[in-house]
Amino acid sequence: AAGADIIQSSGYQATVAGFKGLGYGTEEAIELVKLSVHLAVQARNEFLEAKANGALTLRGIKLGEETPEGVKYFSEGALPKPLVAASVGPYGAFLADGSEYRGYPDVQTEYLEVFHIPRLALFCEENPDILSFETIPSYAEAIAIARAMSDPFTSKGIPAWIAFSCKDGHHVSSGETIIKCAQMIDKVHPITGIGINCTKPEYVESLIKDIRTVTDKPIAVYPNLGESYDSKTKTWYGDAAS
C-alpha cells in the first residue's frame, strides 16, 4: 500500500543565521526555522482530525474510490499514527559547499555543538515525534549532536536518529569507521537509532553489517539513487541504480 509512516519536515538546511543572511530579521528567522516542523505537525494533525470525524474530504481531496491505499488502510485502523520527523541537517548544509560529503577537520566539536543547540531547541518547540539528523559526515559532529541531545532542556526528551553520509562500505565521509560511530551512538540514550543516507547504494549492505556488529539499535537506510553529485554545480550526473 502506498503511504508513509513518517512525515519529514523541510528544515534540513534551515538556520537562523541562514535566514538572516537572506535579509530576514531575527524574530522572522526564528519563526521560519520553527515553521518547517510546525507545518508537518499541522498536516499530520489535520489528517488525524479528518479520520476521527469521518470526514469525506482531506484538505480538499475527496476520500473515495481514488483514495490512495495507504490512506484507506489508515482510515480503517490498519496503519499506525504517522510520525513527524524534524529533519536536522549538518553544519555542512548550512555552509552549502558540499562539505557534508567530506567533513570539516578544522572545525572543533565544541563549535559544532554550539551550532546545533539553538536550532535543535527551536525544532523541539514544535514537538516533533523524532529528530532526524541527516548526512552527518563525521564522528566529531555526531559527538556534538549527542552532547546537544543529552541536554533535556534542549531536546525535551524527544528521541533521535543520526544518519551518516559514507564514502565507502566501512567509513563515514570524513574517514572514521562507521563502527566507531555506531559504538558511540549505542551508548547515548537519547539517540535511539543510526542511519545511512546520501550514500551510494552499493555501500549500504556492508555498512549495515558493520553497524550491527556493535549495536542492536534500529537502522534507518535511505541512500542515493546511485548517481554522483557535483558539489560545484550542485547537480547530479550518471545513471541511477535499478
Residues covered by each model-derived region:
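Domain-level signal for soluble alpha/beta catalytic cores
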Residues: A1-S242
